[in-house]
């Protein structure tokens, strides 16, 4: 198995050999000693945002523990932003900038297990997004009353776009964060976690203070600035808060009614909402949406589907608001369970896209769920593997959404035991709650939980862009069948039916045959709605 895996990695490497990665990519995506030598414990961000100048000024207090003795660490801040000073124990530290990396020198070696805090002062005009959230950066807009309406989305681009941070998914602040943001009077800032209070600074600005108790991905730390109205709701064990533009209050009260049944569904299938200490918020934003932890960005214009369209093309997708359901699903898959490297972002996106189908099954039943998830197949591009290249800030194919979701549906039907499947999914979410994991961790878990070696299936769908082809032909009472377009060790069953009978086959690359009395093409069917494969009738 190890040799087969090396072959896969080699093939993946050959496919990506022409990809040009820069030093900037390696500095952001790589793990060198200047990063691994310390562990971030907490961020305390205190900034002022000037909407007119589109500028930020302030500091981030970064608390960390030294893991191995070091005299130099790496933090990150986009090179268009200014480092004003970095202070440790009242001393200004020397630093060097290399692209977006900031290498900080201490006057003495820091001992292992010692704890420290440095204050990183900075300022500047952060990058403006051309098309958020796909292109990272700030969005400065106005509401219908001419008031500022501001947001930020940086997934993939990097949180260091707007604040100094260890810009790696491998390290979340274990003790959470505080986010204090001063904005012009008459505006409100909504960030992650619980609202602690506001303070008029007597200079035309009011500071809004927020506190996060849980570990948090650096790219989900956020600011949302507008003339918001606060709508409060509650479940027995969870506060629900909605911050919406004043003009949309009535629409929001009606539209967000789907949040409670969504939460009930997700908690029954994935376990308790992971960040109940920090509450759950939907915050209206000037872009489509993003999974900001405990402050989910919402910009779907209070429409069903995806901006009023059904991405599945089946009609089922118009039953729910895509952004509310999908981005909330990320609270379990992406925010709670996080991938070590963005090359493994399928751990976020595949499971979250699958959560849409789970919600439909909770609300409308299995048949509509299958209709919806199979409708997603039309969006699969088969352009490149789902898993990207490690260590260079490189995501794999966008097929991680739909193909990844269809992979999970396939695994459900390979296991062919719904009670077992739902327990596996629930236990997966609970086992790796608030943990940072790799693809190997996921595969190993599902192998052990299912009692089946699913590795060849995962490899086929994650590491190649080839979809298995089930080739068959019927001659008299005989069915001839085999797999094509698969790796040599591919091993996956598929179900067929005829005359009200359902039979499980175990095809290989070599043609097999089976005698089935009363077999005829009219009653013959292949359950390709349960397995993401292509079907081809042979000659």
Please name every model-derived segment.
Residues 18, 210, 242-486:
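Hydrophobic alpha-helical and helix-loop surface patches within well-folded domains
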Residues 83-88, 454-455, 470, 474-528:
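Beta-strand-rich binding/interaction modules
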Residues 59-80, 164-169, 176-184, 440, ...:
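Surface-exposed beta-strand/loop patches in extracellular or lumenal glycoproteins
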Residues 1-24:
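Bacterial Sec-dependent N-terminal signal peptides
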Residues 23-24, 119-227, 523-533:
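Extended, low-hydrophobicity, Ser/Thr/Pro/Gly-biased non-transmembrane segments
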Residues 73, 78-141, 204, 513-519:
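A surface-exposed beta-strand-loop module
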Residues 19-57, 65, 84, 141-147, ...:
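N-terminal, polar/Ser/Thr-rich
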């Amino acid at each position: 198995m190890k040799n087969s895996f090396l072959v896969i990695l080699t093939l993946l490497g050959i496919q990506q050999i022409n990809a040009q990665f820069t030093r900037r990519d390696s500095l952001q995506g790589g793990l060198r000693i200047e990063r691994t030598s310390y562990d971030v414990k907490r961020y305390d961000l205190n900034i002022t945002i000037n909407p007119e100048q589109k500028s930020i000024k302030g500091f981030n207090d970064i608390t960390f523990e030294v893991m191995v003795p070091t005299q130099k660490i790496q933090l990150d801040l986009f090179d268009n932003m200014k480092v004003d000073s970095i202070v440790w124990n009242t001393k200004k530290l020397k630093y060097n900038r290399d692209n977006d990396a900031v290498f900080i020198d201490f006057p003495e070696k820091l001992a292992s297990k010692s704890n420290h805090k440095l204050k990183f002062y900075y300022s500047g005009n952060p990058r403006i997004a051309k098309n958020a959230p796909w292109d990272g950066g700030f969005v400065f807009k106005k509401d219908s009353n001419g008031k500022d309406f501001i947001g930020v989305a940086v997934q993939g681009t990097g949180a260091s776009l707007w604040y100094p941070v260890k810009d790696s998914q491998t390290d979340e602040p274990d003790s959470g964060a505080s986010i204090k943001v001063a904005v012009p009077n008459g505006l409100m800032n909504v960030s992650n976690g619980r609202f602690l209070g506001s303070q008029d600074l007597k200079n035309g600005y009011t500071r809004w203070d927020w506190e996060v108790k849980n570990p948090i991905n650096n790219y989900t730390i956020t600011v949302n600035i507008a003339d918001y109205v606060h709508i409060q709701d509650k479940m027995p064990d969870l506060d629900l808060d909605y911050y919406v533009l004043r003009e949309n209050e009535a629409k929001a009260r009606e539209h967000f009614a789907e949040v409670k049944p969504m939460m009930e569904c997700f908690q029954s299938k994935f376990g308790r909402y992971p960040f109940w200490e920090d509450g759950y918020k939907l915050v209206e934003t000037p872009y489509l949406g993003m999974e900001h932890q405990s402050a989910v960005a919402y910009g779907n214009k209070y429409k069903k589907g995806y901006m009023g369209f059904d991405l599945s093309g089946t009609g089922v997708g118009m039953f729910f608001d895509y952004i509310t359901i999908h981005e909330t699903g990320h609270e379990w898959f992406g925010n709670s369970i996080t991938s070590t490297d963005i090359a493994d972002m399928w751990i976020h996106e595949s499971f979250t896209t699958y959560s849409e189908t789970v919600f439909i099954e909770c609300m409308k039943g299995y048949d509509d769920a299958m209709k919806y998830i199979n409708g997603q197949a039309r969006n699969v591009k088969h352009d490149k593997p789902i898993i990207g290249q490690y260590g260079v800030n490189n995501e794999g194919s966008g097929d991680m959404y739909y193909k990844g979701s269809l992979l999970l549906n396939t695994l459900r039907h390979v296991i062919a035991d719904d009670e077992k499947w739902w327990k596996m999914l629930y236990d997966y979410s609970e086992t790796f709650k608030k943990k940072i994991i790799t693809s190997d961790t996921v595969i190993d878990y599902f192998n052990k939980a299912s009692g089946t070696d699913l590795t060849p299936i995962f490899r086929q769908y994650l590491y190649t862009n080839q979809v298995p082809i089930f080739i068959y032909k019927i001659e008299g009472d005989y069915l001839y069948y085999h797999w094509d377009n698969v790796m040599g060790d591919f091993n996956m069953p598929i179900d067929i039916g005829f005359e009200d009978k359902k039979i499980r086959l175990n095809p290989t690359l070599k043609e097999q045959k089976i005698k089935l009395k009363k077999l005829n093409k009219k009653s013959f069917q292949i359950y390709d709605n349960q397995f993401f494969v292509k079907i081809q009738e042979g000659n």
